[in-house]
């Protein structure tokens, strides 16, 4: 019986040893899995934080860029408004020329156009006192003295503020103040911008 007890005891001891070994193996495996999962979670966390930081920087840069662009556009719009105001004031100054200066502008402009003497000068109703019959007669006499026809006529139906339009056989040459300033605007805008904002 003692052999049986020894054998039973040995089996129980072996089983206990095997159990301890299996439990130790399982514990080691558990620790290994937990460590691996913890490391993976830590790496994932770092990756997520890095991506979030990159996305935040990109978003921040985009917001700053959009804000700068918006400010730039607002400044350009404000500058353009100021420049437009300057050109509009120039038109107003031309519209407020004295009668003598206004006539001088018209006469010097007409002299530069090489008139045939049969054209129609279109003016607005407001300027009819400046361009009287005496003015027209003097202009036609001057043209006749140059060997041209002296039959220029006036049309007071212009829908513009200041200046005139010369109609030569249906072809109109626009010498209104608005047209004059607008034709010069492209050339002068850069210079006006420099004077105003530099």
Swiss-Prot record:
One of the record's GO cellular component terms: proton-transporting two-sector ATPase complex, catalytic domain
Name used for this protein in its record: V-type ATP synthase subunit E
Gene3D superfamilies: ATP synthase, E subunit, C-terminal (3.30.2320.30), F1F0 ATP synthase subunit B, membrane domain (1.20.5.620)
Role: Produces ATP from ADP in the presence of a proton gradient across the membrane.
GO annotation, biological process: proton motive force-driven plasma membrane ATP synthesis
Cross-referenced InterPro entries: ATPase_E_C, ATPase_V1_Esu
Classification via Pfam families: vATP-synt_E (PF01991)
HAMAP family: ATP_synth_E_arch
Species assigned in the record: Clostridium perfringens (strain SM101 / Type A)
Gene: atpE
Keywords: ATP synthesis, Hydrogen ion transport, Ion transport, Transport
Family: Belongs to the V-ATPase E subunit family.
Record GO terms (molecular function): ATP binding; proton-transporting ATP synthase activity, rotational mechanism; proton-transporting ATPase activity, rotational mechanism
